UniProtKB/Swiss-Prot annotation:
Gene from which this protein is expressed: ispE
Pathway in which the depicted protein is active: Isoprenoid biosynthesis; isopentenyl diphosphate biosynthesis via DXP pathway; isopentenyl diphosphate from 1-deoxy-D-xylulose 5-phosphate: step 3/6
Protein name: 4-diphosphocytidyl-2-C-methyl-D-erythritol kinase
Disulphides: none
Top-tier EC class: transferase
Amino acid sequence: MSPVISHPRSAAARHQSDELSPITITVDCPAKTNLTLEVGPAHDEWGGRHELDTIYCAIGVYDTVTATAKQPGAGFSLELEGAYLGDLASSRSDMRRNHAVLALFAMAQAAEREPDVALTITKRIPVGAGLGGGSADAAATMLAVNRLWELNWPIERLRTIAATLGADMPFCLTGGLAYGTGFGERITDIAPGSRDELALIEQGFSGEVLVGAYQSQLSTPEVYHTFDIVGAAEGDRNHLQAAAISLHPRSGQAIDAATQAGASHAFVSGSGPSVVAFAADEAAAQRIIEVWRDTAVVDRIIRAKSPEHPNISVRQ
């Protein structure tokens, strides 16, 4: 059974006079990976987060967030669905820490209204996998609420709010390709057909995208702590890769297997443990799939496209 929890607001909460919206907003938001991820020093003013210089890429593994307005005073509710909930399924006691709920609260505070919204999240992006699933859920919630409440705020305003919640969330609002700096929250989009996108294609970041996923998860703080000890390996485009592999050796085995099978690129996604492999064509993709299956170096294989973008739909 999907975990469901509802939090009504207090009796002292301000009366909200807006009429209940009759519509439901559904947002499909893709996962993210990092084509490059350079990690710099930690900054106290950023709460100990590290300086990052990255190229984000949205890949076609989608979580779906559905938002429906509730009666004034009803508070929020959250329902989680899907076969790959990870530790989210055991977090019923504190749904207020869910990224989507935090995003809902942030939007409500910025809009000066109550978070009387029913959220349903269908999870397909692996949890704790370095694929930005929580960030995708938060971004999808912000996009949904922006439409549900008819705020019509521009992306830049949404990104300002998202930056207070997490590093990847500002990127996930738009997906595609983008540069990320600061602690990852400062986004410069890479336009389709631009010189920068063509350069990435020439480097082999095109064609089939394969994700090797795992039942196990990695804690992002633990990966960064390990990075502070072991540093980055020479030649790694992802500075966190060595740390992730030291904590989850199968990721390294999956990278080696994909590379030997002809992957254009194979690397740990973000803080791991998921591995992303780019294949130039269908034949290369099939070789990678076969070797991953034969060697059992991953638990689940996902085929995806890139770069992808969020999709928003409205139902009366």
